[in-house]
Amino acid sequence: MAEEQARHVKNGLECIRALKAEPIGSLAIEEAMAAWSEISDNPGQERATCREEKAGSSGLSKPCLSAIGSTEGGAPRIRGQGPGESDDDAETLGIPPRNLQASSTGLQCYYVYDHSGEAVKGIQDADSIMVQSGLDGDSTLSGGDNESENSDVDIGEPDTEGYAITDRGSAPISMGFRASDVETAEGGEIHELLRLQSRGNNFPKLGKTLNVPPPPDPGRASTSGTPIKKGHRREISLIWNGDRVFIDRWCNPMCSKVTLGTIRARCTCGECPRVCEQCRTDTGVDTRIWYHNLPEIPE
């Protein structure tokens, strides 16, 4: 999944750079619209007309008729058939990094697929691919999601359709790149980040580590030879709510377990005195005392 997303990001960035370098000219749009209006009544002649234009150099000044679809929002649409795609998949029309007159191999088209192979509206919707229409046979606008299956093919080797990867466009895109090959227009920061992340799983992380001591062995616990002193212990609870302090004080037998909260425990050993001598003179025991200010609390 990460490789697929990286491919979409790289293709989208290259298309955006191409559009920024040479935006779509109004003349090219008008010619595409005129060509589409001529064949709208007879769509069966689209493929034959396109092949006739590719046969001669004079066809470079006109758009490939099979690549033109309906228009939305003033932007022409193109139609591309890739592996597993139908003729009805309308794609967004764009202009490659070269002008139509300057291209020596034929018209180059720009189109956008989503992950399901459906047409995507808008040029900046981005998993787009620059392709070349001056190829042989039905490889004119090959592309789409099925190209991700050939992502392991090296440059120069034929894909599953039998066409060399290096024949795609004046600036070919390697389909063998991985997520670590992604570079943005600003530089190679993402490339370096992905490289470090990929290495992080194979090498131990440097820096300080927290050494947690093992739990103590109960068998080796030192036991005191003196018995636990019998009697009572004083427990105090302080609650502060921002403007006042509440204090609870009480006593519990020494043999009882210390727990959080105002809990009156009972003697478990049977040897603790029933009445605490300190509680006899302490009027605050078992009575909540509150103070408005901290200095008012006696030490």
UniProtKB/Swiss-Prot annotation:
Q: Does the keyword Metal-binding apply?
A: yes
Positions annotated to bind Zn(2+) 1:
232, 251, 276, 279
Region annotation (Disordered) ranges: 41-99, 134-162
Q: Which GO terms describe its biological process?
A: symbiont-mediated suppression of host cytoplasmic pattern recognition receptor signaling pathway via inhibition of IRF7 activity; symbiont-mediated suppression of host cytoplasmic pattern recognition receptor signaling pathway via inhibition of MDA-5 activity; symbiont-mediated suppression of host JAK-STAT cascade via inhibition of host TYK2 activity; symbiont-mediated suppression of host JAK-STAT cascade via inhibition of STAT1 activity; symbiont-mediated suppression of host JAK-STAT cascade via inhibition of STAT2 activity; symbiont-mediated suppression of host type I interferon-mediated signaling pathway
Positions marked as site (Interaction with host STAT2) = 240, 246, 248, 250
Which GO CC terms are listed, alphabetically? host cell cytoplasm
One GO MF term on file is: metal ion binding
| Principal location listed in the UniProt entry | host cell
Keyword vocabulary terms for this entry: Host cytoplasm, Host-virus interaction, Inhibition of host innate immune response by virus, Inhibition of host interferon signaling pathway by virus, Inhibition of host IRF7 by virus, Inhibition of host MDA5 by virus, Inhibition of host RLR pathway by virus, Inhibition of host STAT1 by virus, Inhibition of host STAT2 by virus, Inhibition of host TYK2 by virus, Interferon antiviral system evasion, Metal-binding, Viral immunoevasion, Zinc
Cellular location of this protein? Host cytoplasm
Q: Which residues does the annotation say bind Zn(2+) 2?
A: 255, 267, 269, 272
Q: Where is this region: Interaction with host STAT1?
A: 110-120
Q: Where is the composition biased (Low complexity)?
A: 134-145
Compositionally biased region (Acidic residues): 146-160
**What family is reported?**
Belongs to the paramyxoviruses V protein family.
Record text about domains = The N-terminus interacts with host JAK1 and STAT1. The C-terminus interacts with host STAT2. The C-terminus also interacts with host PP1.
Q: What is this protein called?
A: Non-structural protein V
